[in-house]
Design a protein with these regions (language model features):
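Residue(s) in the substrate-gating loop at a strand-loop-helix junction
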Residues: 141
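Alpha-helical segment proximal to the catalytic Tyr-Lys
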Residues: 125, 169-174, 232
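Active-site helix of classical SDR
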Residues: 120, 157, 165
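C-terminal helical subdomain
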Residues: 180, 199-230, 234, 241-243
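Conserved glycine-rich cofactor-binding loop
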Residues: 18-20
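Short C-terminal tail/terminal secondary-structure segment
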Residues: 2, 146, 224, 235-257
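Substrate-binding pocket helix/loop in short-chain dehydrogenase/reductase
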Residues: 96-109, 204
Length: 257
């Protein structure tokens, strides 16, 4: 039977929850009256709130092990528990692997893989004290599942995140469920930087079976499901939220002129 979860007494920690996909996830949990805590390097210009529910902000460099440990301890001390963790912080510009320095490549891997492991580690140390019901969701990308020129380090990191998810799900069961979401092309405030003009974005949308780019809300809905009682037997999986992926190139090539 479908269950309508009550998030009013749940504490949700979201990394990178001030913009893009992360902001959509933050707003979704706030709309359900969850206590939302954002971990990010830069404080938003104004407090994020929905229906009078306000997100709390903790400044944190998720690539800094000592800083993460300190902040998670502060969050736990103030809130007594952490029920849900969304590892969303990440991203990378497109650049050919040989045009980037190894310092750059390593920084991308740190942000998109190692930081999620670090935050999960310190949060799980707190979560494991509960008998059950805690959830960690890692935000991955379709780049993890197929070659993407210009995203070697990013794709490797996101692929590693999917594997990390599966391993931690086994290690930390049954008290903590761990899943990942493989996101497709998502339209955010920075889309023009990645995809070019609005005309280019429409062209990209036409390659998707659902004929549109995704929204942060599409990813947020998947997060809500994975942290709900309706997914209580789902762990160690990667849910693909990408509108059907991309239409195979041969379909367009084979179309009669």
């Amino acid at each position: 039977m479908f269950k309508t979860d009550n998030y009013k007494n749940k504490t949700v920690v979201i990394t990178g929850g001030t913009k893009g996909i992360g902001l959509g996830i933050t707003k979704a949990y706030l709309s359900l009256s969850a206590k939302v805590i954002i971990l990010a390097r830069n404080k938003p210009k104004k407090q994020i709130q929905v229906k009078g529910n306000k997100a709390l902000f903790y400044q944190c460099n998720v690539r800094d092990n000592a800083n993460v440990e300190e902040v998670i301890n502060e969050v736990f001390k103030a809130n007594k528990c952490i029920d849900v963790l969304i590892n969303n912080a990440g991203g990378a510009p497109l650049i050919n692997s040989l045009d980037a320095s190894m310092n750059f490549n390593n920084a991308i891997i740190d942000l998109n893989l190692n930081s999620s492991f670090t935050v999960s580690y310190y949060v799980a140390k707190k979560m494991i004290k509960k008998s059950s019901g805690c959830v960690i969701t890692n935000i991955s990308s379709v780049t993890a599942t197929r070659p993407t020129p210009g995203s070697a380090a990013y794709g490797a990191a996101k692929g590693g995140l999917v594997n990390l998810t599966k391993t931690l799900a086994v290690e930390w069961a049954p008290r903590i469920r761990v899943n990942s979401i493989i996101t497709g092309y998502i339209e955010t405030e920075n889309s023009l930087i990645h995809y070019g003009s609005k005309k280019d974005m429409k062209a990209v949308a036409k390659t998707i079976p659902m004929q549109r780019m995704g929204t942060p809300e599409d990813i947020a809905n998947a997060c809500i499901f994975l942290s709900s009682a309706n997914s209580s037997w789902i762990t160690g999986t990667a849910i693909e939220v990408h509108g059907g992926g991309e239409s195979p190139a041969y379909l367009n090539s084979a179309k009669p002129k």
